[in-house]
Amino acid sequence: MKRLTPALLAVCLACSFSPAALAAEAQQTRAFRALPADFIKGADISTLLDAEKHGAKFYNHNNQQQDPIAILKADGVNYVRLRLWVDPKDAQGQGYGGGDNDLAATLALAKRAKAQGMKLLLDFHYSDFWTDPGKQFKPKAWEKMDYPQLKTTIHDYTRDTIARFKQEGVLPDMVQIGNEINGGMLWPEGKSWGQGGGEFDRLAGLLNAAIDGLKENLQNGEQVKIMLHLAEGTKNDTFRWWFDEISKRNVPYDIIGLSMYTYWNGPISALKANMDDISRRYNKDVIVVEAAYAYTLENCDNAENSFQAKEEKEGGYPATVQGQYNYIHDLMQAVADVPDQRGKGIFYWEPTWIAVPGNTWATPAGMKYIHDEWKQGNARENQALFDCQGKVLPSAKVFN
């Protein structure tokens, strides 16, 4: 995920538009062509627990308060993605924000999702806070480790985490080994470029160590799909460069994960061309593991949104409920159309991340850890699938 919040503040406009008027915009539904029965209709709900702790409430299409996971399930969502940070707090115990996704929070959400009959994708960040192509900070406890120590630690951490999920009865169905790791992970030892040579040898060693740790906990036919995830899903040259290098080093994996934001990355047609190519080139399944679009340009809090008029112009769809619906529909269809049934599904990024006072992308402690001093708040609530008052949008029905 790219930078989450701009530097400026916008006035609060939460009351200046009518949810009912927005809802009226998304009455036009569209059928899919040959969507497989097992197609993944996923949602990343990693901030949900923290939003609820700060007072967020959610309402179904009948205006009845309900668990948002149950609301999403009723609209067809069948898979949940949850990120995991190692230790998202400072030495004084101040949480970093962004969902405070430590082991306890992630397990709690995993149990709720599994109780709804959903499958689980666990997203290991191998950091204490946000990671993406521009930052891959080592966990604080790992900072002074050399490369051999990092290999041992990532192995043991992955092994022990999966063991805990098994113990709690929520073994993931799929695991990401790192998040948007175009630039590698656990910098600088695991960085994929600019380190004087041997970058992919070291990165592959870390990936293999983590995967070995995962597999130590699988027995009696248990299967967990392994995903490697890059950002900028339209950039075929990036995916070829990265996966060619990983393939040379025999890193075992099942799925290529892609992030896809049309307002940053370009049109869905370019994503489709990339998925067609890499699924054939590497003989792997593909999943769009992050995607989102705005349903309005209005703002629900004091933090200026990352999706504004510029993003609407570049994103290819109007910032309306119908536009959001059409974006998700077209994305799902593009993935389903990947040849040889290699396109397995999508995950919508943070449908439940509505604006709630106190629930922020980063606290001052979190900003200090990632060296990114911005304003607190939510810069993405206009891309949720619930409105500012917590009512599910008609666009969520696209999954049905």
Language-model features, listed with the residues they occupy:
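Glycoside hydrolase catalytic-domain groove-lining segments
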Residues: 62, 66-69, 201, 215-225, ...
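Active-site beta-loop-alpha junctions enriched in small/polar residues
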Residues: 45-48, 85-87, 125-129, 177-182, ...
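N-terminal carbohydrate-binding accessory modules
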Residues: 24-77
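Substrate-binding cleft and catalytic face of glycoside hydrolase catalytic domains
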Residues: 71-226, 231
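Acidic-and-aromatic substrate-binding clefts and catalytic sites of carbohydrate-active enzymes
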Residues: 51-52, 56-63, 88-92, 96-104, ...
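Bacterial N-terminal signal peptides
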Residues: 8-16
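Aromatic-rich peripheral "rim/lid" segments of glycoside hydrolase catalytic domains that contact
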Residues: 31, 56, 273, 277-280, ...
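Conserved, mostly hydrophobic/aromatic
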Residues: 43, 72, 123, 175, ...
